[in-house]
């Protein structure tokens, strides 16, 4: 009977949550469960494309599409609401649009920027966090070029951009900037030699997930296109002028008209309020992706700190992992509904590609290093495949990179 259907509640329509729902609706009949998906926006956005929208190499509208395009309305109730409280013991979730009970819960609330308590970073630096922050940043950068061109008294700081962090997001953003800046210089009649791009990284090495050869390739590519790197240089503060860094024990002020922070993310702040043992918005999973003490609550994606059996550190937060977790969670939910035991999650690492603008990149694919146009092509394949898996061939054709 319909009233006996188990209530499956999925929070978040990012890669993990939406993958869970799209697989569930394929594998379950309409009367197998009452599935509800809650997301604070009516759209899903490709968070792995935010660096492009932030630089202005794509329009912000290019990276989003309506969640309704991906869900089967006969099987899934999609609710646009913001989650305000998760009561795991009462099996209830509160939102700004009402209260929802659950039998099985999937928490996939995504990430927010993490500034590690650096003084002034939240107030004075742009964050690459979501569609709105990316749109704001790209407009700001173009406005700086327009203002410079229109001003009688030129301020070269308008053409200076500081990027905090030489990890994945920072390097991909810099790559996009090296594509975008020649366009802006041409559009506004600006001498490109006056543009200054500086990347500041506290660690002794950038892109730590890659080999020294790949890192050297990426550094040379970006340096040849005007990027200056300050490695092993911690940022200790951010103000209206730019970053304050520490060099040989002394503080120095780096000045720029635009400061961007890319060096950290964390899970949703709601995690600390809802679960125990949470660090930086992430909770440690059991091997089947549920959490300790709750065999009917799955935590996946950026809110998950999954440590594979026999290892000591959690897997990183990537779209590839999030989507695999979503698929596995859907399979485990089906098992629970059928009265079967859940299965452990096994991550398959197919590789990682870091773009350097639209036509270059570096990466590891099934254990092999790749670089150049081959890497750039593969990145486009990966991006398009993600859309296909969530929204099907039609959406991939419309929104994909080909």
UniProtKB/Swiss-Prot annotation:
What does it catalyze?
a quinone + NADH + H(+) = a quinol + NAD(+)
Q: Which residues form the active site?
A: 172
* Gene Ontology cellular component list: plasma membrane
Please tell me where this protein is predominantly located: membrane
Q: Which cofactor does it need?
A: FAD
List ligand-binding residues for FAD.
12-16, 39-40, 83, 302, 319-320, 379
Alphabetical UniProt keywords: Cell membrane, FAD, Flavoprotein, Membrane, NAD, Oxidoreductase
Write down the InterPro entries for this protein, in alphabetical order: FAD/NAD-bd_sf, FAD/NAD-binding_dom, NADH-Q_oxidoreductase
This entry's comment on the bound cofactor is: Binds 1 FAD per subunit.
Q: Does the keyword Transmembrane helix apply?
A: no
Q: What EC number(s) does its UniProt record assign?
A: 1.6.5.9
Is Iron included in the keywords of this UniProt record?
no
Q: Which family does it belong to?
A: Belongs to the NADH dehydrogenase family.
**What the protein does?**
Alternative, nonproton pumping NADH:quinone oxidoreductase that delivers electrons to the respiratory chain by oxidation of NADH and reduction of quinones, and contributes to the regeneration of NAD(+).
State what protein this is by name.
Type II NADH:quinone oxidoreductase
Q: What is the lineage of its organism?
A: Bacteria, Bacillati, Bacillota, Bacilli, Bacillales
